[in-house]
């Protein structure tokens, strides 16, 4: 039985700013772009979340929810530097590490002899080391597989740990709301709910063939997760060709302005994933993908060796010329990596993005 730890830093960017600026600790704080430039919230502290502020929210709307919100632009170079410091802490415990972004990673400690092989004690010690050396808190999930560990890390946030043992995993999974499953976003969740499916137990009681017919290739994934099955290994050393983020929309968007706002929302996520995969931000291309409401899609990708948000806007304009009168149901950004990048291809779907 495997022992997987998911470490997730607590409101990472905001936590760094509060650490370095104590005056921010007890006030609503967010990292993101300004409202007058159609900015988007990258993350916020827990004080701001009490007002309903969330990541990927338009800054202008966040200001309406919380007029006293303090907004700072963020310091990505510093966040990346601290992330590398945290990664070095991970390496003291295992070399089987799959970074997901600057603020979260999977660790496989199945073969570790530290703490007599106790994944729980290893996770506790990792959290201790992170706090002692960075003055930042991390939450941890411990489980026999990746997706359960990821869900568990969110159970006792902030600054908590949740352990799901092989004996308790089935009971934990079957009561989960389907929206908790990574990859199940608003669109998929609404379809599940319309079928009368709300928990993993509901999926278990549903005929498999009918379920797969309804959801296509994603059907077996939801089915497996609902049964607590996730046999994916950690991605630690294969060649990554690209990094991308995309979001499927609950409602089609129809204007260029809405597409630009979505680009602003996705860009910080892409930057975070890229910095985890390629700390020097080495790229060889940038691309934009649009999927239309007739399920046709278009991708515009050009060689570009310096990451540039403005260039994404140029690519988006080119892609929008192919739209005609169709609505847009998915927007994606991607970068191609040099062949020397010792990482693997991955696209992240943020239709279900959780607030950390």
UniProtKB/Swiss-Prot annotation:
PROSITE patterns: UMUC (PS50173). Keywords: Cytoplasm, DNA damage, DNA repair, DNA replication, DNA-binding, DNA-directed DNA polymerase, Magnesium, Metal-binding, Mutator protein, Nucleotidyltransferase, Transferase. It is found in: Cytoplasm. Binds 2 magnesium ions per subunit. It is an enzyme of class 2 (transferase). Mg(2+) binds at residues 8, 103. The active site is at residue 104. The record marks 13 as: Substrate discrimination. One of its GO terms (cellular component) is cytosol. GO terms for molecular function: damaged DNA binding; DNA-directed DNA polymerase activity; magnesium ion binding. One of its GO terms (biological process) is error-prone translesion synthesis. Its cofactor is Mg(2+). Its EC number is 2.7.7.7. It catalyses: DNA(n) + a 2'-deoxyribonucleoside 5'-triphosphate = DNA(n+1) + diphosphate. Its main location: cytoplasm. It comes from the Bacteria. Residues 4-185 form the UmuC domain. Monomer. Belongs to the DNA polymerase type-Y family. This is DNA polymerase IV.
